[in-house]
Amino acid sequence: DFLDYIAFSTIIEGKIFKEDFNINADFKSINPDKFYDSISADFNLIKNLYRRTFINKKKVKDICDKGPDESTFEEYWVDMGVYGSFNRGDIYLSKGLKLINGYSFLKKGFTKNYDLILDYGHHKGKGSIDNSQLLSLNRYGFTSVLRNKFKLIDFDKYKKEYDNSFRYSPNVNDKGLWINGKISTGAYQYSNGLSQSVIQAGVGPELVLGNLKNKFLDFTSFTLTPEFNYKKGFSPLKFDNFNDHSRLIFDFKQQLYGPILLGFNASLNLQNDHPEYGKFFDRKFSLFISRRAYSIDLTYNEAEEYVLFNFNIFNFGYKDYSPSF
């Protein structure tokens, strides 16, 4: 049926009783006979319990007043969340509670972010050993991530103002060479007695060149992100099984001509005792059309064999920075 070839996604964000919520829904077909089976969705409802923001060690109420680049910005917060998923990937039905603790630090050339999430939920989904098996289990545990980003070289000695020469970008690119570091850990316990835990760590470079103003090869973005893993145990559920091998993640984006950019993302298996050692996986190929007012992305996922279409609109408050084009 022709209607099976038409699909769409929607994201709804807003507030309910002054609390933040979002719904992300996919409709894989608009065929009315298959409508129920084609729907997948997840939602989050977040209530802030505590938040403190400091600029140069002074408490502030409005984070819009960050001040000059020399300012030191710090923020602490605690959120309570309710979440749920339906027919999403390897999940049939999922619901739970989470407590989110966060810390953010920003100073010129250096950022640090830390998150700790405590989670309790009930999940029904495919088994990790037998995909035909549907398991229904309670799960509790935590995940934590520490990320650091340090700018080694700044290619923007003289910061540029946004003007009518930026035809292919809605903002000024932050150019330079960074070192990104990440340490993460997590552990889950399941109601059938199984458990899993993992520690991940890695340090890698990020390079951004060009202004995306000129027509030919005026933007390059390249990131290498190694992840070295140590894992113990495994999940009985397929959807949340922690990655069990070390890998190197490549991400590359290059302007070809005018608004046309190409992108490539993939992971290289670094686990020498793994049967897929030395092979690329999760390969994605992207084509971008980037303009000041909008962008169009087409991404082909080789493993899943699908094409993702994304359309963004920018700068609703645009004030005649450039003539029509």
Question: Predicted regions: what is each one?
Answer:
Residues 1-325:
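Long, low-hydrophobicity, solvent-exposed regions enriched in small/turn-prone and acidic residues
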